[in-house]
Design a protein with these regions (language model features):
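Extended, low-hydrophobicity, Ser/Thr/Pro/Gly-biased non-transmembrane segments
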Residues: 34, 88-167
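Early extracytoplasmic/domain-onset interaction patches
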Residues: 1-36
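Acidic/His/Gly-enriched intrinsically disordered linker/tail segments
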Residues: 287-294, 299-379, 417
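Solvent-exposed beta-hairpin/edge-strand motifs
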Residues: 32-61, 125-142
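Pan-zinc metallopeptidase signature
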Residues: 342-425, 431, 444
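Beta/coil-rich, acidic/histidine-enriched accessory regions frequently appended to metallopeptidases
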Residues: 1-3, 7, 13-15, 88, ...
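Juxtacatalytic substrate-recognition/specificity segment
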Residues: 172-304
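A surface-exposed beta-strand-loop module
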Residues: 7-9, 40-103
Length: 584
Protein backbone atom coordinates (compact mmCIF):
# COMPACT_ATOMS: atom_id res chain seq x y z
CA UNK A 1 0.00 0.00 0.00
CA UNK A 2 1.04 3.58 -0.71
CA UNK A 3 0.93 5.99 2.24
CA UNK A 4 0.63 9.71 1.49
CA UNK A 5 0.81 12.62 3.92
CA UNK A 6 -0.22 16.08 2.70
CA UNK A 7 0.62 19.29 4.54
CA UNK A 8 -0.71 22.67 3.34
CA UNK A 9 1.47 25.78 3.58
CA UNK A 10 -0.98 28.62 3.09
CA UNK A 11 1.35 31.61 2.89
CA UNK A 12 3.51 29.90 0.29
CA UNK A 13 0.53 28.48 -1.63
CA UNK A 14 2.14 25.07 -1.61
CA UNK A 15 1.40 21.54 -0.53
CA UNK A 16 4.22 19.39 0.76
CA UNK A 17 3.68 15.69 0.13
CA UNK A 18 5.29 12.64 1.66
CA UNK A 19 5.02 9.14 0.22
CA UNK A 20 6.04 6.09 2.26
CA UNK A 21 6.37 2.72 0.53
CA UNK A 22 8.51 -0.44 0.55
CA UNK A 23 11.84 -0.69 -1.24
CA UNK A 24 11.24 -2.32 -4.66
CA UNK A 25 12.77 -5.72 -5.28
CA UNK A 26 15.34 -4.36 -7.74
CA UNK A 27 16.21 -1.36 -5.53
CA UNK A 28 15.17 1.07 -8.28
CA UNK A 29 12.00 3.02 -7.61
CA UNK A 30 10.49 4.58 -10.73
CA UNK A 31 8.12 7.47 -10.00
CA UNK A 32 5.88 9.49 -12.30
CA UNK A 33 3.37 12.32 -12.18
CA UNK A 34 0.36 12.46 -14.52
CA UNK A 35 0.55 14.88 -17.43
CA UNK A 36 -3.23 15.19 -17.85
CA UNK A 37 -6.50 14.65 -16.05
CA UNK A 38 -9.22 12.22 -17.21
CA UNK A 39 -12.05 14.14 -18.83
CA UNK A 40 -9.83 17.06 -19.87
CA UNK A 41 -7.95 16.04 -22.98
CA UNK A 42 -4.91 18.28 -23.05
CA UNK A 43 -1.44 17.87 -21.58
CA UNK A 44 -1.31 20.02 -18.44
CA UNK A 45 2.34 19.26 -17.62
CA UNK A 46 1.77 19.19 -13.87
CA UNK A 47 5.40 18.34 -13.21
CA UNK A 48 6.26 21.95 -13.95
CA UNK A 49 4.85 22.85 -10.51
CA UNK A 50 6.64 20.08 -8.62
CA UNK A 51 9.84 21.02 -6.75
CA UNK A 52 12.28 19.81 -4.11
CA UNK A 53 11.89 16.08 -4.63
CA UNK A 54 13.96 14.10 -2.13
CA UNK A 55 14.19 10.41 -1.16
CA UNK A 56 15.21 8.88 2.18
CA UNK A 57 15.83 5.54 3.82
CA UNK A 58 15.60 6.28 7.52
CA UNK A 59 17.90 9.34 7.83
CA UNK A 60 19.91 8.50 4.73
CA UNK A 61 19.22 10.60 1.64
CA UNK A 62 19.15 8.57 -1.56
CA UNK A 63 19.98 9.68 -5.12
CA UNK A 64 17.04 10.89 -7.22
CA UNK A 65 17.48 11.20 -10.97
CA UNK A 66 14.98 12.81 -13.33
CA UNK A 67 14.69 10.76 -16.52
CA UNK A 68 11.92 12.65 -18.35
CA UNK A 69 9.69 15.66 -17.84
CA UNK A 70 7.45 13.78 -15.39
CA UNK A 71 9.48 10.71 -14.33
CA UNK A 72 12.13 10.15 -11.69
CA UNK A 73 14.20 7.19 -10.53
CA UNK A 74 15.28 6.65 -6.92
CA UNK A 75 18.40 4.53 -6.44
CA UNK A 76 17.73 2.54 -3.27
CA UNK A 77 20.71 0.20 -3.55
CA UNK A 78 21.91 1.22 -0.08
CA UNK A 79 18.62 0.25 1.56
CA UNK A 80 17.78 -3.33 2.59
CA UNK A 81 14.85 -4.98 0.83
CA UNK A 82 12.83 -5.00 4.06
CA UNK A 83 13.19 -1.23 4.51
CA UNK A 84 10.73 1.52 3.69
CA UNK A 85 11.41 4.59 1.59
CA UNK A 86 10.21 8.11 2.23
CA UNK A 87 9.79 10.38 -0.79
CA UNK A 88 9.13 14.09 -0.24
CA UNK A 89 8.25 16.90 -2.64
CA UNK A 90 6.32 20.15 -2.92
CA UNK A 91 3.67 21.36 -5.36
CA UNK A 92 2.82 24.99 -6.08
CA UNK A 93 -0.96 25.43 -5.80
CA UNK A 94 -2.34 28.78 -6.90
CA UNK A 95 -4.44 28.03 -9.97
CA UNK A 96 -8.23 28.35 -9.81
CA UNK A 97 -9.28 25.50 -12.06
CA UNK A 98 -11.17 22.22 -12.05
CA UNK A 99 -8.02 20.40 -13.14
CA UNK A 100 -5.47 22.18 -10.93
CA UNK A 101 -4.49 22.75 -7.30
CA UNK A 102 -5.17 25.80 -5.18
CA UNK A 103 -4.45 27.00 -1.64
CA UNK A 104 -5.02 30.25 0.23
CA UNK A 105 -6.50 31.33 3.59
CA UNK A 106 -10.08 30.66 2.50
CA UNK A 107 -9.88 27.47 0.52
CA UNK A 108 -7.80 24.59 -0.71
CA UNK A 109 -8.41 22.31 -3.66
CA UNK A 110 -6.46 19.32 -4.94
CA UNK A 111 -6.99 17.69 -8.30
CA UNK A 112 -5.06 14.46 -7.62
CA UNK A 113 -3.18 14.47 -10.93
CA UNK A 114 -1.39 17.63 -9.82
CA UNK A 115 -0.09 16.17 -6.57
CA UNK A 116 0.24 12.41 -6.41
CA UNK A 117 3.64 11.30 -7.60
CA UNK A 118 3.35 7.50 -7.72
CA UNK A 119 5.33 4.39 -8.66
CA UNK A 120 5.20 3.52 -12.35
CA UNK A 121 3.24 0.46 -13.45
CA UNK A 122 1.36 0.06 -10.20
CA UNK A 123 -2.30 -0.14 -9.29
CA UNK A 124 -2.02 -0.85 -5.58
CA UNK A 125 -4.20 0.64 -2.84
CA UNK A 126 -3.35 3.95 -1.23
CA UNK A 127 -4.25 5.92 1.86
CA UNK A 128 -4.02 9.68 2.20
CA UNK A 129 -3.45 11.51 5.49
CA UNK A 130 -3.60 15.26 6.04
CA UNK A 131 -1.55 17.22 8.54
CA UNK A 132 -3.86 20.21 8.36
CA UNK A 133 -4.90 21.68 11.73
CA UNK A 134 -7.61 24.25 11.30
CA UNK A 135 -8.91 22.71 8.07
CA UNK A 136 -11.79 20.40 7.21
CA UNK A 137 -11.09 18.06 4.31
CA UNK A 138 -13.79 16.73 1.98
CA UNK A 139 -13.35 13.85 -0.47
CA UNK A 140 -15.54 11.15 -1.99
CA UNK A 141 -13.21 8.38 -0.78
CA UNK A 142 -14.11 6.49 2.41
CA UNK A 143 -12.38 7.82 5.54
CA UNK A 144 -10.99 5.25 7.97
CA UNK A 145 -8.57 5.88 10.85
CA UNK A 146 -8.09 9.50 9.69
CA UNK A 147 -7.00 8.41 6.21
CA UNK A 148 -8.80 8.56 2.89
CA UNK A 149 -8.79 5.06 1.40
CA UNK A 150 -8.36 4.40 -2.35
CA UNK A 151 -8.66 0.85 -3.63
CA UNK A 152 -6.29 1.47 -6.52
CA UNK A 153 -4.39 4.14 -8.42
CA UNK A 154 -7.33 4.93 -10.69
CA UNK A 155 -9.53 5.69 -7.69
CA UNK A 156 -6.77 7.72 -6.03
CA UNK A 157 -6.34 9.93 -9.10
CA UNK A 158 -10.10 10.31 -9.61
CA UNK A 159 -10.93 11.65 -6.14
CA UNK A 160 -10.32 15.40 -5.62
CA UNK A 161 -10.16 17.17 -2.26
CA UNK A 162 -11.57 20.45 -1.00
CA UNK A 163 -10.14 22.05 2.14
CA UNK A 164 -12.27 24.54 4.08
CA UNK A 165 -11.42 26.49 7.27
CA UNK A 166 -12.87 24.93 10.41
CA UNK A 167 -14.34 28.30 11.37
CA UNK A 168 -16.70 27.81 8.42
CA UNK A 169 -15.84 31.10 6.75
CA UNK A 170 -17.05 31.19 3.15
CA UNK A 171 -17.93 27.48 3.04
CA UNK A 172 -21.33 25.84 2.73
CA UNK A 173 -21.40 22.10 3.40
CA UNK A 174 -24.52 19.98 3.59
CA UNK A 175 -25.88 16.60 2.53
CA UNK A 176 -29.01 15.62 0.65
CA UNK A 177 -30.35 12.17 -0.18
CA UNK A 178 -31.34 11.06 -3.66
CA UNK A 179 -32.68 7.54 -4.19
CA UNK A 180 -31.29 6.60 -0.78
CA UNK A 181 -27.74 7.72 -1.60
CA UNK A 182 -26.06 10.60 0.31
CA UNK A 183 -24.95 13.46 -1.91
CA UNK A 184 -22.66 15.90 -0.12
CA UNK A 185 -22.52 19.48 -1.40
CA UNK A 186 -19.43 21.60 -0.71
CA UNK A 187 -19.52 25.18 -2.00
CA UNK A 188 -16.85 27.80 -1.41
CA UNK A 189 -16.52 31.42 -2.47
CA UNK A 190 -19.74 32.99 -1.17
CA UNK A 191 -21.27 33.92 2.17
CA UNK A 192 -24.92 33.57 1.18
CA UNK A 193 -26.79 30.69 -0.47
CA UNK A 194 -30.38 29.54 -0.54
CA UNK A 195 -29.52 25.97 0.46
CA UNK A 196 -33.14 24.86 0.66
CA UNK A 197 -33.85 25.85 -2.94
CA UNK A 198 -30.59 24.37 -4.20
CA UNK A 199 -31.17 21.14 -2.26
CA UNK A 200 -34.62 20.71 -3.74
CA UNK A 201 -33.46 21.38 -7.29
CA UNK A 202 -30.30 19.29 -7.11
CA UNK A 203 -32.24 16.37 -5.64
CA UNK A 204 -34.56 16.52 -8.66
CA UNK A 205 -31.55 16.54 -11.01
CA UNK A 206 -30.00 13.56 -9.23
CA UNK A 207 -33.17 11.47 -8.99
CA UNK A 208 -34.19 12.19 -12.58
CA UNK A 209 -30.76 11.14 -13.85
CA UNK A 210 -30.72 7.99 -11.74
CA UNK A 211 -34.17 7.09 -13.12
CA UNK A 212 -32.92 7.76 -16.66
CA UNK A 213 -30.15 5.17 -16.32
CA UNK A 214 -31.96 2.68 -14.10
CA UNK A 215 -35.72 3.15 -14.54
CA UNK A 216 -36.55 -0.10 -12.72
CA UNK A 217 -34.44 -0.13 -9.54
CA UNK A 218 -33.32 3.51 -9.51
CA UNK A 219 -29.95 2.54 -8.06
CA UNK A 220 -26.87 4.64 -8.91
CA UNK A 221 -23.47 2.98 -9.41
CA UNK A 222 -21.88 4.73 -6.40
CA UNK A 223 -22.44 4.63 -2.64
CA UNK A 224 -21.79 8.32 -2.07
CA UNK A 225 -21.54 11.39 -4.29
CA UNK A 226 -19.60 14.60 -3.65
CA UNK A 227 -20.39 17.81 -5.52
CA UNK A 228 -17.60 20.34 -4.97
CA UNK A 229 -18.00 23.86 -6.33
CA UNK A 230 -16.04 27.09 -6.10
CA UNK A 231 -17.60 30.43 -6.94
CA UNK A 232 -15.85 33.43 -8.43
CA UNK A 233 -16.58 36.22 -10.87
CA UNK A 234 -16.58 34.95 -14.45
CA UNK A 235 -15.86 31.33 -13.51
CA UNK A 236 -17.52 28.44 -15.33
CA UNK A 237 -16.68 24.80 -15.90
CA UNK A 238 -17.00 21.27 -14.65
CA UNK A 239 -15.08 18.01 -14.48
CA UNK A 240 -16.62 14.64 -13.85
CA UNK A 241 -15.43 12.01 -11.39
CA UNK A 242 -16.71 8.50 -10.67
CA UNK A 243 -18.30 9.54 -7.37
CA UNK A 244 -18.51 13.29 -7.72
CA UNK A 245 -17.76 16.40 -9.69
CA UNK A 246 -15.86 19.66 -9.39
CA UNK A 247 -17.67 22.75 -10.67
CA UNK A 248 -16.80 26.41 -11.14
CA UNK A 249 -19.52 29.04 -11.32
CA UNK A 250 -20.14 32.75 -11.00
CA UNK A 251 -21.92 33.50 -7.69
CA UNK A 252 -24.39 35.74 -9.51
CA UNK A 253 -26.15 32.68 -11.01
CA UNK A 254 -27.05 31.12 -7.64
CA UNK A 255 -29.92 32.14 -5.33
CA UNK A 256 -28.82 33.92 -2.16
CA UNK A 257 -30.28 33.19 1.26
CA UNK A 258 -33.84 34.47 1.40
CA UNK A 259 -34.02 34.99 -2.37
CA UNK A 260 -37.23 33.30 -3.47
CA UNK A 261 -36.81 33.83 -7.22
CA UNK A 262 -33.47 32.52 -8.54
CA UNK A 263 -31.38 34.63 -10.92
CA UNK A 264 -32.16 34.33 -14.62
CA UNK A 265 -28.96 32.36 -15.25
CA UNK A 266 -29.64 29.83 -12.47
CA UNK A 267 -30.56 27.28 -15.12
CA UNK A 268 -26.95 27.55 -16.33
CA UNK A 269 -25.84 26.03 -13.03
CA UNK A 270 -28.52 23.32 -13.06
CA UNK A 271 -27.60 22.36 -16.62
CA UNK A 272 -23.92 22.18 -15.70
CA UNK A 273 -24.69 20.01 -12.68
CA UNK A 274 -26.87 17.74 -14.84
CA UNK A 275 -24.11 17.44 -17.45
CA UNK A 276 -21.45 16.37 -14.96
CA UNK A 277 -23.79 14.07 -13.03
CA UNK A 278 -24.75 12.31 -16.28
CA UNK A 279 -21.03 11.66 -16.78
CA UNK A 280 -20.99 9.43 -13.69
CA UNK A 281 -22.49 6.85 -16.05
CA UNK A 282 -21.40 7.97 -19.52
CA UNK A 283 -17.61 8.56 -19.30
CA UNK A 284 -16.81 7.28 -15.81
CA UNK A 285 -18.41 3.84 -16.32
CA UNK A 286 -19.26 3.59 -20.01
CA UNK A 287 -16.06 4.71 -21.68
CA UNK A 288 -13.76 4.12 -24.68
CA UNK A 289 -11.63 0.99 -24.45
CA UNK A 290 -8.49 3.12 -24.83
CA UNK A 291 -9.22 4.59 -21.37
CA UNK A 292 -9.21 1.20 -19.65
CA UNK A 293 -6.97 1.83 -17.90
CA UNK A 294 -6.05 5.48 -18.31
CA UNK A 295 -2.48 6.18 -19.37
CA UNK A 296 -1.88 9.65 -17.94
CA UNK A 297 1.71 9.87 -19.15
CA UNK A 298 0.82 10.77 -22.75
CA UNK A 299 -2.00 11.57 -25.15
CA UNK A 300 -4.53 8.77 -25.58
CA UNK A 301 -6.44 9.10 -28.84
CA UNK A 302 -10.09 8.30 -29.50
CA UNK A 303 -12.39 9.01 -32.44
CA UNK A 304 -15.40 8.65 -30.14
CA UNK A 305 -15.34 11.59 -27.73
CA UNK A 306 -18.37 12.91 -29.65
CA UNK A 307 -20.37 10.06 -28.11
CA UNK A 308 -19.45 10.76 -24.52
CA UNK A 309 -19.60 14.56 -24.62
CA UNK A 310 -22.10 15.00 -27.44
CA UNK A 311 -24.69 12.64 -25.96
CA UNK A 312 -24.24 14.23 -22.54
CA UNK A 313 -24.66 17.69 -24.06
CA UNK A 314 -27.97 16.58 -25.56
CA UNK A 315 -29.33 15.23 -22.27
CA UNK A 316 -28.02 18.04 -20.04
CA UNK A 317 -31.19 20.01 -20.90
CA UNK A 318 -33.56 17.03 -21.08
CA UNK A 319 -32.82 16.14 -17.45
CA UNK A 320 -33.89 19.55 -16.03
CA UNK A 321 -36.98 19.44 -18.28
CA UNK A 322 -38.04 16.06 -16.91
CA UNK A 323 -37.25 17.25 -13.40
CA UNK A 324 -39.74 20.13 -13.90
CA UNK A 325 -36.99 22.68 -13.36
CA UNK A 326 -37.49 24.27 -16.77
CA UNK A 327 -40.50 24.43 -19.05
CA UNK A 328 -40.65 23.19 -22.62
CA UNK A 329 -40.15 26.68 -24.06
CA UNK A 330 -36.90 27.07 -22.12
CA UNK A 331 -35.77 23.63 -23.22
CA UNK A 332 -36.25 24.45 -26.90
CA UNK A 333 -34.56 27.81 -26.38
CA UNK A 334 -31.50 25.99 -25.03
CA UNK A 335 -31.78 23.53 -27.88
CA UNK A 336 -31.70 26.35 -30.41
CA UNK A 337 -28.73 27.92 -28.67
CA UNK A 338 -26.83 24.64 -28.95
CA UNK A 339 -27.76 24.43 -32.64
CA UNK A 340 -26.43 27.96 -33.22
CA UNK A 341 -23.25 27.34 -31.24
CA UNK A 342 -22.44 24.49 -33.59
CA UNK A 343 -23.66 25.71 -36.97
CA UNK A 344 -22.75 29.35 -36.38
CA UNK A 345 -19.07 28.51 -36.82
CA UNK A 346 -17.62 28.05 -40.28
CA UNK A 347 -15.49 25.24 -38.91
CA UNK A 348 -18.63 23.14 -38.50
CA UNK A 349 -18.17 21.48 -41.88
CA UNK A 350 -14.38 21.70 -41.94
CA UNK A 351 -13.92 18.77 -39.52
CA UNK A 352 -15.78 15.53 -39.03
CA UNK A 353 -16.83 14.53 -35.54
CA UNK A 354 -14.30 11.70 -35.60
CA UNK A 355 -11.55 14.18 -36.48
CA UNK A 356 -12.69 16.63 -33.82
CA UNK A 357 -12.57 13.87 -31.20
CA UNK A 358 -9.17 12.59 -32.27
CA UNK A 359 -7.64 16.08 -32.32
CA UNK A 360 -9.00 17.25 -28.97
CA UNK A 361 -5.46 17.32 -27.58
CA UNK A 362 -4.30 19.99 -30.00
CA UNK A 363 -7.49 21.76 -31.10
CA UNK A 364 -10.51 21.89 -28.79
CA UNK A 365 -8.42 22.67 -25.71
CA UNK A 366 -6.03 24.95 -27.57
CA UNK A 367 -8.31 27.48 -29.24
CA UNK A 368 -6.85 30.17 -31.49
CA UNK A 369 -8.46 33.03 -33.39
CA UNK A 370 -8.56 30.70 -36.40
CA UNK A 371 -10.47 27.96 -34.57
CA UNK A 372 -14.00 29.16 -35.50
CA UNK A 373 -13.02 28.98 -39.18
CA UNK A 374 -11.35 25.57 -39.10
CA UNK A 375 -12.65 23.53 -36.16
CA UNK A 376 -15.86 22.14 -34.73
CA UNK A 377 -16.65 21.05 -31.20
CA UNK A 378 -17.53 17.42 -30.52
CA UNK A 379 -19.69 18.75 -27.68
CA UNK A 380 -22.04 20.94 -29.73
CA UNK A 381 -21.86 19.08 -33.05
CA UNK A 382 -21.93 15.79 -31.17
CA UNK A 383 -25.22 16.80 -29.54
CA UNK A 384 -26.70 17.48 -32.99
CA UNK A 385 -25.50 14.08 -34.20
CA UNK A 386 -27.03 12.46 -31.12
CA UNK A 387 -30.37 14.08 -31.95
CA UNK A 388 -30.24 12.79 -35.53
CA UNK A 389 -29.14 9.30 -34.48
CA UNK A 390 -31.98 9.10 -31.96
CA UNK A 391 -34.45 10.23 -34.62
CA UNK A 392 -33.16 7.59 -37.04
CA UNK A 393 -33.56 4.89 -34.38
CA UNK A 394 -37.10 6.02 -33.66
CA UNK A 395 -38.06 6.04 -37.35
CA UNK A 396 -36.47 2.67 -38.13
CA UNK A 397 -38.03 0.96 -35.11
CA UNK A 398 -41.45 2.61 -35.35
CA UNK A 399 -40.87 4.27 -32.00
CA UNK A 400 -39.70 1.20 -30.08
CA UNK A 401 -36.09 2.40 -29.72
CA UNK A 402 -34.44 5.75 -29.16
CA UNK A 403 -30.95 6.78 -28.14
CA UNK A 404 -32.15 6.85 -24.54
CA UNK A 405 -33.23 3.21 -24.75
CA UNK A 406 -29.85 2.28 -26.24
CA UNK A 407 -27.96 3.96 -23.41
CA UNK A 408 -30.13 2.29 -20.78
CA UNK A 409 -29.72 -1.13 -22.40
CA UNK A 410 -25.98 -0.62 -22.82
CA UNK A 411 -25.45 0.22 -19.16
CA UNK A 412 -27.72 -2.60 -17.98
CA UNK A 413 -25.81 -5.10 -20.13
CA UNK A 414 -22.31 -4.23 -18.89
CA UNK A 415 -23.02 -2.95 -15.38
CA UNK A 416 -21.84 -6.08 -13.59
CA UNK A 417 -18.65 -6.21 -15.67
CA UNK A 418 -17.93 -2.57 -14.86
CA UNK A 419 -18.35 -3.34 -11.17
CA UNK A 420 -15.96 -6.30 -11.19
CA UNK A 421 -13.56 -4.47 -13.55
CA UNK A 422 -13.75 -7.02 -16.37
CA UNK A 423 -15.38 -4.79 -19.00
CA UNK A 424 -13.03 -3.79 -21.81
CA UNK A 425 -14.83 -0.61 -22.90
CA UNK A 426 -16.23 0.54 -26.24
CA UNK A 427 -13.86 -0.22 -29.14
CA UNK A 428 -12.88 2.79 -31.22
CA UNK A 429 -15.57 3.35 -33.85
CA UNK A 430 -17.68 0.56 -32.39
CA UNK A 431 -20.89 2.37 -31.51
CA UNK A 432 -22.86 1.29 -34.60
CA UNK A 433 -22.04 -2.36 -33.92
CA UNK A 434 -23.05 -1.91 -30.29
CA UNK A 435 -26.40 -0.44 -31.32
CA UNK A 436 -27.04 -3.36 -33.67
CA UNK A 437 -26.17 -5.88 -30.94
CA UNK A 438 -28.58 -4.22 -28.52
CA UNK A 439 -31.44 -3.42 -30.89
CA UNK A 440 -31.05 -5.37 -34.12
CA UNK A 441 -31.38 -2.05 -35.97
CA UNK A 442 -28.69 -1.26 -38.57
CA UNK A 443 -27.52 2.29 -37.97
CA UNK A 444 -23.97 2.20 -39.37
CA UNK A 445 -24.93 4.25 -42.43
CA UNK A 446 -26.32 7.06 -40.28
CA UNK A 447 -23.27 7.19 -38.02
CA UNK A 448 -20.86 6.97 -40.94
CA UNK A 449 -22.59 9.89 -42.66
CA UNK A 450 -22.81 12.27 -39.69
CA UNK A 451 -19.63 11.26 -37.87
CA UNK A 452 -16.94 10.09 -40.28
CA UNK A 453 -17.84 11.15 -43.82
CA UNK A 454 -15.81 14.22 -44.90
CA UNK A 455 -17.29 17.31 -46.54
CA UNK A 456 -20.88 16.81 -45.44
CA UNK A 457 -22.27 20.27 -46.12
CA UNK A 458 -24.14 22.17 -43.42
CA UNK A 459 -27.14 22.27 -45.77
CA UNK A 460 -27.50 18.51 -45.29
CA UNK A 461 -27.34 18.91 -41.53
CA UNK A 462 -29.96 21.65 -41.54
CA UNK A 463 -32.26 19.63 -43.81
CA UNK A 464 -31.94 16.51 -41.66
CA UNK A 465 -32.40 18.55 -38.54
CA UNK A 466 -35.53 20.16 -39.93
CA UNK A 467 -36.99 16.73 -40.72
CA UNK A 468 -36.21 15.42 -37.24
CA UNK A 469 -37.80 18.49 -35.69
CA UNK A 470 -40.92 17.99 -37.81
CA UNK A 471 -41.28 14.54 -36.23
CA UNK A 472 -41.60 16.44 -32.93
CA UNK A 473 -43.94 19.11 -34.25
CA UNK A 474 -41.21 21.75 -34.46
CA UNK A 475 -39.35 23.72 -37.11
CA UNK A 476 -36.44 26.12 -37.49
CA UNK A 477 -36.82 29.81 -38.21
CA UNK A 478 -34.52 32.83 -38.16
CA UNK A 479 -34.23 34.26 -34.66
CA UNK A 480 -36.35 37.41 -34.73
CA UNK A 481 -35.03 38.37 -31.30
CA UNK A 482 -31.69 39.29 -32.87
CA UNK A 483 -31.23 42.88 -34.02
CA UNK A 484 -31.23 42.39 -37.78
CA UNK A 485 -28.52 44.83 -38.83
CA UNK A 486 -26.34 43.81 -35.90
CA UNK A 487 -26.62 40.13 -36.82
CA UNK A 488 -25.97 40.93 -40.47
CA UNK A 489 -22.86 42.98 -39.73
CA UNK A 490 -20.62 40.14 -38.50
CA UNK A 491 -19.65 42.27 -35.50
CA UNK A 492 -19.80 40.76 -32.04
CA UNK A 493 -18.17 42.32 -28.98
CA UNK A 494 -16.74 40.73 -25.87
CA UNK A 495 -15.13 42.28 -22.83
CA UNK A 496 -11.38 41.81 -22.45
CA UNK A 497 -10.15 43.54 -19.33
CA UNK A 498 -10.73 47.26 -19.81
CA UNK A 499 -11.13 46.85 -23.58
CA UNK A 500 -13.93 45.73 -25.85
CA UNK A 501 -12.68 43.19 -28.37
CA UNK A 502 -14.24 41.71 -31.45
CA UNK A 503 -15.09 38.05 -31.16
CA UNK A 504 -15.22 35.66 -34.14
CA UNK A 505 -15.83 37.62 -37.36
CA UNK A 506 -17.46 35.37 -40.00
CA UNK A 507 -15.85 35.48 -43.41
CA UNK A 508 -18.07 37.00 -46.10
CA UNK A 509 -19.59 39.27 -43.44
CA UNK A 510 -19.34 43.06 -43.86
CA UNK A 511 -16.97 43.22 -40.90
CA UNK A 512 -14.66 40.61 -42.41
CA UNK A 513 -14.76 42.33 -45.81
CA UNK A 514 -13.76 45.57 -44.09
CA UNK A 515 -10.65 43.82 -42.77
CA UNK A 516 -11.72 43.33 -39.16
CA UNK A 517 -10.71 40.21 -37.24
CA UNK A 518 -11.07 38.68 -33.80
CA UNK A 519 -9.06 40.57 -31.22
CA UNK A 520 -9.42 43.97 -32.85
CA UNK A 521 -10.52 46.70 -30.43
CA UNK A 522 -13.21 48.93 -32.02
CA UNK A 523 -13.50 52.39 -30.46
CA UNK A 524 -15.79 54.35 -32.78
CA UNK A 525 -18.56 53.68 -35.30
CA UNK A 526 -19.99 56.35 -37.58
CA UNK A 527 -18.20 59.01 -35.55
CA UNK A 528 -19.58 57.84 -32.19
CA UNK A 529 -17.71 56.21 -29.31
CA UNK A 530 -18.51 52.51 -28.96
CA UNK A 531 -19.85 51.17 -25.66
CA UNK A 532 -20.75 47.58 -24.91
CA UNK A 533 -24.29 48.36 -23.75
CA UNK A 534 -25.37 50.27 -26.87
CA UNK A 535 -23.24 48.66 -29.58
CA UNK A 536 -26.06 46.66 -31.15
CA UNK A 537 -28.25 49.78 -31.36
CA UNK A 538 -25.36 51.73 -32.90
CA UNK A 539 -25.05 49.15 -35.65
CA UNK A 540 -28.82 49.22 -36.20
CA UNK A 541 -28.63 52.98 -36.72
CA UNK A 542 -26.09 52.42 -39.52
CA UNK A 543 -28.22 49.91 -41.45
CA UNK A 544 -28.28 50.48 -45.20
CA UNK A 545 -25.23 52.76 -45.20
CA UNK A 546 -21.46 52.59 -45.61
CA UNK A 547 -19.94 53.92 -42.39
CA UNK A 548 -16.53 54.45 -40.87
CA UNK A 549 -15.29 52.14 -38.13
CA UNK A 550 -12.19 52.99 -36.09
CA UNK A 551 -10.32 50.28 -34.19
CA UNK A 552 -6.99 49.31 -32.69
CA UNK A 553 -5.08 46.26 -33.89
CA UNK A 554 -2.40 45.95 -31.28
CA UNK A 555 -1.11 49.50 -30.84
CA UNK A 556 -1.94 50.60 -34.38
CA UNK A 557 -5.01 52.77 -34.95
CA UNK A 558 -6.89 51.76 -38.10
CA UNK A 559 -9.83 53.27 -39.98
CA UNK A 560 -11.96 51.19 -42.39
CA UNK A 561 -15.20 51.48 -44.32
CA UNK A 562 -17.95 49.13 -43.13
CA UNK A 563 -20.49 48.34 -45.84
CA UNK A 564 -23.90 47.73 -44.28
CA UNK A 565 -25.75 48.47 -47.52
CA UNK A 566 -24.79 45.67 -49.92
CA UNK A 567 -26.62 42.30 -50.01
CA UNK A 568 -25.11 39.53 -47.89
CA UNK A 569 -23.86 36.28 -49.40
CA UNK A 570 -25.79 33.04 -48.90
CA UNK A 571 -22.74 31.52 -47.18
CA UNK A 572 -22.88 34.20 -44.52
CA UNK A 573 -26.66 34.15 -44.15
CA UNK A 574 -26.52 30.44 -43.29
CA UNK A 575 -24.52 31.32 -40.16
CA UNK A 576 -27.23 33.55 -38.71
CA UNK A 577 -28.92 32.40 -35.47
CA UNK A 578 -32.08 30.32 -35.71
CA UNK A 579 -34.57 29.18 -33.13
CA UNK A 580 -37.00 26.30 -32.75
CA UNK A 581 -40.74 27.03 -32.91
CA UNK A 582 -43.95 25.03 -33.25
CA UNK A 583 -44.97 23.85 -36.71
CA UNK A 584 -48.44 25.33 -36.40
Amino acid sequence: MLHYLITPHVRRHRYSVQLVLPVPYDNLLKLELPTWTPGSYVLREYAGRLTNIRAYWEDNELPVRQVSKAQWVVDAAEAPVSATLRIEWEVFAYSVGIHDAYLDDDRGFINPSTLFLHPSNTNEPAEVFFDAPGWNVQCALPLRANAWQARNLDELLDSPYTLTPKDGHGAHIWTIEACGIPHQIVITGTNSLNQDRMSSDLRKIFETTIAFWDPDEKKPPFERYLLQMHLGAGLYGGLEHAAGTMLLEDPKVLPAEGETTPPKDYIEFLTLAAHEYFHAWLVKRLKPSCFLPYDLSKEVYSHDLWIFEGFTSLYESIIPLRADLIDEATYWEQFGRRFNNALGREGFDQMTLAESSFNAWIKLYRQTKDSPYSQTSYYAKGALAAFLISDALEQRSNGEWSLEHVLQSWFRTVRSKITDRTWSGLPDGGFAELVFELTGIPIADVIEHWVSKPNVDRCEWIAAFSTALEHRGKKLTLDANQHQAYALSGLKLRRSGADLELDYVPSASPAFEAGLFAGDVPIALDGMRITFERFDRMVEACAGRIVEIVFFRGDRLTVRQLDLASPRSDAFLMLLPQRVIDLS
